[in-house]
Amino acid sequence: MNTSISSTNSGTYRGVRAAAGAAGRREPVGEAVEELCAAVFTSLRRRDQRERGRQYVRGLLAAQGRKSIRNIAQQLTAGAGAGGAAAAEQSLHHFIAASTWDWQPIRAALSQYLGGTAPLNAWVAQPMAIPKGGEHSVGAGHRFDPHRGQMFRGQQAFGTWFTSAGVVTPVGWRLHLREEQEAADESYEECAVTAVLDTLREARESGAATRPVVLDVRDIATRAALNRFAEARVPVVGRISPEARLLVTDPRLPGFGAGTLAARDVLQNVRGLRMPVEWPDPELPGARRTSLVAAVRVMVPDPAPGRRREVLLFGEWEAARRLPTQLWVTDMVRTEPGALVRMTKTAHRVSAAAGASVQDVGLRDFSGRSLPGWHRHVTLASVAHAARCLAPAAAPVAASVPVRHSPLHRPRAHAAVLAGR
């Protein structure tokens, strides 16, 4: 007898409900899943696809350990026996790896939904290394991770994160493929920039406002990357290499007329202009930190004179007598440096959120050679991550417990949105 996931509802899910009740589990995340899935799965034309997506999201949140399709299927069919779990696994595998549904509209709908919870402060682009031991995962291989400065074996992905006053969650992804695979001529930098611009294009088409991008990828703010953001008319703040060559444009400042200088030297020459900037510690709610910050207008050398333009180089010192620890450039040259430094701290919020919850929703757990399958998995894992962020209180979610539909608790809107560019 062929047992589908939906056919196990009446018997199996009563067992899951009883087990959940015995464990004293609450369901705020489950309520968030129901409302969020109803909002973001509208592009799935068939009802069974929408139901399968909802079950997959619940399974990601409920399954213990690695969030493999097999583990999710076993969680969904607890008590149904080996036959029911095997049928569920086959059905889920087809839904993720062999189906034809498009993940991009779901990502766009997720961005739109999140924008309704609180004003978007900034997009943050960060790399995500995915260790993989075997050869059976798309894009896996021996790689150098510039963000961490070390070799590893696995996949390299780039995530684009939505950040507001109360929500930090990923909405877009791109996988950097090895040479023998599709898009083999795409560099690490090109992949990172394309990842965020693709996400922003989808968000814009869904009505999202243009907000700055924080490129939290080591040494990413090259001339080519900055030009791509300028062409897309997206304001950007990006990390820059201390050795990157820049031209000082202010005749009153040291280094003017001296040709190109290393970014670190430009900042060291103006360290007398440093000012203290206070910022909230994203890892310690209520705590505040102070850094020394200096900013100077510079030009990124470009062989095409028409594309030469001023950007603002700013650096952050954690200790007065040492070199700057963070170097950034931005095209928002009229924005106050303190506001820019505080904006870069959203990247710390993303790092903290990624470290705490990426494993909980299985963003790194897809195994298989299917690139569309990888995209579908990380898209649904992003929905699961968003549900955890939006729930009134984090709590385990049972894979199949029916929940009552009720309005989500929505974070309060951020009182002050960064103004000016």
Task: Report each predicted region and the residues it spans.
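Active-site-proximal, Lys/Arg-enriched surface segment
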Residues: 95-171, 176-179
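Electropositive, glycine- and tryptophan-enriched low-complexity nucleic-acid-binding patches
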Residues: 91, 147-210, 324-326
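Short, positively charged, Gly/Tyr-enriched micro-motifs
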Residues: 25, 37-108, 213, 387, ...
